[in-house]
């Protein structure tokens, strides 16, 4: 029975990870397979007064076949200078933007040979008010902050990129901003130096592990934090001024969740630190950026002494969901958005487990039953859809973030776990 169950698990994982991958390649509208990125070096200089930012970018890439063109995702970007270097020569690129498709084609006179190449770009972008890309928000006192929200297809609004989940690369981020403003990103700070202007400082961050562009994150503003740790991993909970003590419960929850996940998974948390920030202006409930999770304030900050049990449950479960994404989605990522259920379904299935161990009196196992029933009801409607569904455009991709990708996918995983047994299923998950 044990061996048979393991065989079933293996076949199911193969179907999820292989057959659906072939399906997404067949149907999805993608960047041409001309080159792949290896690394990005990015410098951002936000200007809060003009609602703009200056950007400078160097992309190290590998050209796959001879070509005179490289296509990047790009939206709301004003290019100032673009060059491509290859085989010892540097050429100015001619640009052909396509606003409808949100791409730009970089053309050079001398074809690029297969092998390494470097794209260098100077540009400006918009600190928009649309809560996507690189945008401006305000706290209750009217103080501005700049923050990113890139999932699913909005990294291209902050820097020209291979803005698809399959194109993983490392990122080196530098931010030049006002000397009194804090800067947070995915990795640890490596330096914080005054200048170049008299009222500025320049903050540099360590090279990230390879990751998808939608997981890059930056926040710049008047922020403060409380801090702790779990399994020697530093954890900080950030807020706008005057609210840092409201992060104590979230910090405690994150410490508990980190310890649970490090025991559950065969790979311990791989990112060195975890920052979490609650923002007044944030469109999503939360976003699982690698090593730096962003939240809507109400889903991270609360008064531990006076908050209801339901409010605490909501915060704890959202934290557990986003931290589960550090493995499901960040470390292991779907090839294309057709399979977003693999990200969201696994994180939703996982979210109650550490909280049930930490707070058994909350009976989150009963909540799982209720959630499964709600998913069954939703899936009985005439307008339901398959878990795996093709999506080509940004608008179609956004539509996939629904109750099917979260609730139904999690319900299917709970069913498989129940059939195979928790330990067999866990062993299969750890082999993905």
Residue ranges and their predicted role:
Residues 11-12, 409:
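Hydrophobic alpha-helical segments, especially transmembrane helices
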Residues 7-8, 21-26:
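Compositionally biased non-globular segments, especially hydrophobic aliphatic-rich helices
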Residues 1-10:
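N-terminal secretory signal peptides that target proteins for export/translocation
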Residues 13-23:
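Bacterial N-terminal signal peptides
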Residues 79, 89, 205, 234-432:
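Hydrophobic alpha-helical and helix-loop surface patches within well-folded domains
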Residues 24-272, 298, 303, 401-407, ...:
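Acidic/His-enriched low-complexity segments
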